[in-house]
């Protein structure tokens, strides 16, 4: 019983105190919210100080880190030794910032001047490299470029300091990072300048865009993901926002469109942004001007924008204009980039990454497509004319620089240029056709104004007056008074039409005309205005008419046709919904198409390219090209239907050691096999579609097979070189150990020396065929005498390689004497000192046996201990140490007991195999 009473009391207490606890919780939340608000304000103030005074901001950050470090030290998380080390680092950084601030303040240059000078350093180094490569004297280059660098930094000493830091940053990124502390203030100044630019743009445009400075920065970042240049995106967003004529819903699309237009027109981003923001007060006028100036809107798109604008939804019309303009601009930019040569496209990417720092060098070092064609034609013409220059040029005509390869490159470039010219011509025709239709439509609309009825003119004025009154903040009574005045002015004018229809019939005809217009737009699957709003307004107007006591003739006519008008408005609203649905479906399909395009593999793109080329060739055949031209072009299409094999960068065992290079070879072999299988699939698919070119496909398949075999042979040769090099290194290290601990006359040292010598000979012999081939190719291209010189060069190269082998063979153990001598000769290197003798083999054997007997009777404590350790990451390391009067040698190998690559290579080279124990 007592328990039940206690439970009831507990429930009552909880129920009665619930409201009190909720009140306390609310108060605690308000206090916490207020505390967080003060904290945010305090943090914002600290960030503001950091932006205004970058050095103060840096010092504040370091002080905060030091405070946090002390807090962790007091709590016992960080030990004393670690605390002292980290605290010392923070103190050094604090001193560096303060010292850099003092030096910058007292120096001859400002931070801005210093930063500007540093930006010019890469260009100066590029000029130096180009001048030296073109053959100028080093002294001349030093006087020219050195003087410019001196002037940039205000003297020889400041220039030497700046360039020393710049070169150190190139050579050693760690020291470059340490030097960056001295220019910490410059980075903060740049960030503050960028943030201030966004804020100024917002206020300069009276915040018509409706976004904050950070929001505008985010829009620029999103646009840069599409355009690839954050600098251009920032400029475009700032220019559009500062104009005060672009809404937030348009900023994203117009920023992306501005960057694209600037790229393919060559205009400045600021100029394009200003022109887009000042196109006109209405979406219709802006669309017409954009179509006229840039040709980026089709006739159908213009009609849709005009229709939306005419129905009073001006902002929606502007949004649609921005979306269509951006979509068409991105497509035009894509066509423009595809028309460029590979070098031009690569240069644009590089120039975007370094903010156009090397624009002046482009025309000299990176030629455009026409300059590439002219250069290749000049090389081929020089080789055909012969002479000394022709012979020299032909001497270097191997690989991708061969005459055949250059001719293929020339044909490909000419074809790309002609195709781009044809595409540009077709695009110009399409653009002109769209512009003509837009101009004709505008002229038609102007002429149509002459024939509008008084009723239509009155309705337009009423609609404009109603919208103007709402924007001005007037009440409905004032707006209705103005509308009544407009109606009265038209009633006083006699109608020029005889037998005019009543108001109800005229409204019904107007709605039917709108329905017919929407049906036409439906065929183009474009979205129109909001007819549902018109239906709601009509229902309100109809209810108002029914509630009135007295009606005018027009109002009575509207009531008489109320059912028909309502039915027509419902049909218009239903059609509008269908148009909106189709628009969304079309947008989804477009997104799906772009998704599939982004997911296509290189093989699929290559197949489509080959198919398109054959389609063009078939059309050309129908146009009347000869069979020989058709066959030659078809063979070239077949030869270019596959891609080149992946290249292997070569052997470099400096970083990862021989094992790392073997892993790279395995990866290269896997890539090569995948490429070969993919190219065979592409070839077979093309063969099925073009069976009449079976002979050409067979020839292309043989080329693929040969290219695959050559690449596999190169990889295998590299694998043999790495294996032999690793074995040579291993036995070389072993011989060094034997020499150190057992002497040069020991059996272990002699065996290791012979093994190292064998691997060196084998590695040299592997390079003999390649050396001969390279020597022959270098000379065979010279006219008339080339083949003969090539044979001679190959023979000389082989002789040199074999001489190297002979030299390796002639290397013997220093000071070795086989028959015994009585005295040390005056010349030569011998392992004897004066007073010592070299005995005969028989005497030496007796001495060795005696020494062995002596050692067998001694303890083994003095003999060295060799530990073999398997660790692939430290393979090749040898460590020696002395412990308890005994030498201990640790030899680290990659594979101790397993059947690894090294074991296989040794077994293959010497015919050895493992046996069970």
From Swiss-Prot:
Residues 852-877 are annotated as: Disordered. This is Tape measure protein. It comes from the Viruses. Its main location: virion. It comes from Pseudomonas phage PAJU2. One of its GO terms (biological process) is symbiont genome ejection through host cell envelope, long flexible tail mechanism. Residues 501-528, 575-602 form a coiled coil. The keyword Coiled coil applies. Serves as a ruler that controls the length of tail by stopping the tail tube polymerization and is probably released from the tail shaft during infection to facilitate DNA translocation into the host cell. Assembles into a multimeric linear form probably arranged as a coil of alpha-helices and stabilized by the covering tail assembly proteins. Its C-terminus fixes the tail tip complex, thereby forming the tail assembly initiator complex. Tail tube proteins polymerize around the tape measure protein, displacing the tail assembly proteins. GO terms for cellular component: virus tail. Keywords: Coiled coil, Viral genome ejection through host cell envelope, Viral long flexible tail ejection system, Viral penetration into host cytoplasm, Viral release from host cell, Viral tail assembly, Viral tail protein, Virion, Virus entry into host cell. It is found in: Virion. The keyword Coiled coil applies. Belongs to the Lambdavirus tape measure protein family. Interacts with the tail initiator complex presumably through its C-terminus domain. Interacts with the tail assembly proteins.
